[in-house]
Amino acid sequence: MASKPEKRVASSVFITLAPPRRDVAVAEEVRQAVCEARRGRPWEAPAPMKTPEAGLAGRPSPWTTPGRAAATVPAAPMQLFNGGCPPPPPVLDGEDVLPDLDLLPPPPPPPPVLLPSEEEAPAPMGASLIADLEQLHLSPPPPPPQAPAEGPSVQPGPLRPMEEELPPPPAEPVEKGASTDICAFCHKTVSPRELAVEAMKRQYHAQCFTCRTCRRQLAGQSFYQKDGRPLCEPCYQDTLERCGKCGEVVRDHIIRALGQAFHPSCFTCVTCARCIGDESFALGSQNEVYCLDDFYRKFAPVCSICENPIIPRDGKDAFKIECMGRNFHENCYRCEDCRILLSVEPTDQGCYPLNNHLFCKPCHVKRSAAGCC
């Protein structure tokens, strides 16, 4: 071969043949350009070079997995018989170096900056896009980072016992028009359609509200109550006490004395006929009722000295002293000679009578010695 490079036409492209050293330099320049392009756009695949084996590289090999390009090992440069080297691969211009953009899939979108909302989940990557990236020897981009869902924190609630208090059973509905009133006599329900009588804070059937003695109907009539039992007027009067003097029924005020009942107008003094009422009274020998004044005037003893009745004075009790068959006031029981008060006890200060006269002991001795009363 001559030192001057020769020009040949292949596939309508001008190819300049260069020595092997220049081939290494050109390959190194192409590799650096591809690396710089990859640094600038990491998501784009490196542009494949158009070589005679390009048409075969695009076809899948029967021994490789579909969807993944088979890796080819470049063959060693074939040596010629004249000791030279085969011509270097043709140098492609800028238009041939770049791949056909129509044949490549669109580049994947850059990872989103904003995090997806909780409601919108990220859409899964299409299977066709992943297959295309695998053919270009590129790994699919990692899925965008997802923020942990900030849902409401679930905390274990307090344990509840297995047996809970059951709610009270619902009250049975009362039938409309039904009555809950009970007759106090027959203990049966009083229907709203029946005649009823309300008395003594109770409910009665009209036919059940009768006198408990003579069974007389009392509905609409006056009645009396005794021990919680309704009575008609005649039966009620029969239960009342009668006056011990006139024998009539005591209806209003009553005075009880001597085990009997009296009208106030019938309980009077037998001497002056004055109503005694709630005053003290005295009884005669035949249980006659006397006021105190008439009783003392009639039955009180009379003092043998002052000849006045011995009766209480000014609310004070009066005591009578009996001696020799005579009655004396305490103040009138004295010695007839020296007028000293005599004692009722049998002592030296007591009474020493002589011929129906009252003497003390010294006067009694003196009268007895003189032989006169």
Swiss-Prot record:
Under SUPFAM superfamilies, the record lists: Glucocorticoid receptor-like (DNA-binding domain)
Stretches of Pro residues bias are at: 104-114
Q: Which Pfam families match?
A: LIM (PF00412)
Q: Where is this region: FERMT2-binding?
A: 276-373
Expression by tissue: Isoform 1 and isoform 3 are expressed in heart, kidney, lung, pancreas, placenta and platelets. Isoform 2 is expressed in brain, heart, kidney, lung, pancreas, placenta, skeletal muscle and platelets.
Give UniProt keywords alphabetically: Cell adhesion, Cell junction, Cell shape, Cytoplasm, Cytoskeleton, LIM domain, Metal-binding, Repeat, Zinc
Q: Which InterPro entries match?
A: Znf_LIM
UniProt keyword Repeat present: yes
Q: Which PANTHER family match?
A: FILAMIN-BINDING LIM PROTEIN 1, ZYX102 PROTEIN
- According to its record, what is known about the domains? The N-terminal region is intrinsically disordered.
What is the annotated quaternary arrangement, including any partners? Interacts with NKX2-5. Isoform 1 and isoform 3 interact with FERMT2, FLNA, FLNB and FLNC. Isoform 2 interacts with FLNB.
What is the name of this protein? Filamin-binding LIM protein 1
* Organism (species): Homo sapiens
Q: What is the lineage of its organism?
A: Eukaryota, Metazoa, Chordata, Craniata, Vertebrata
The gene from which this protein is expressed is FBLIM1
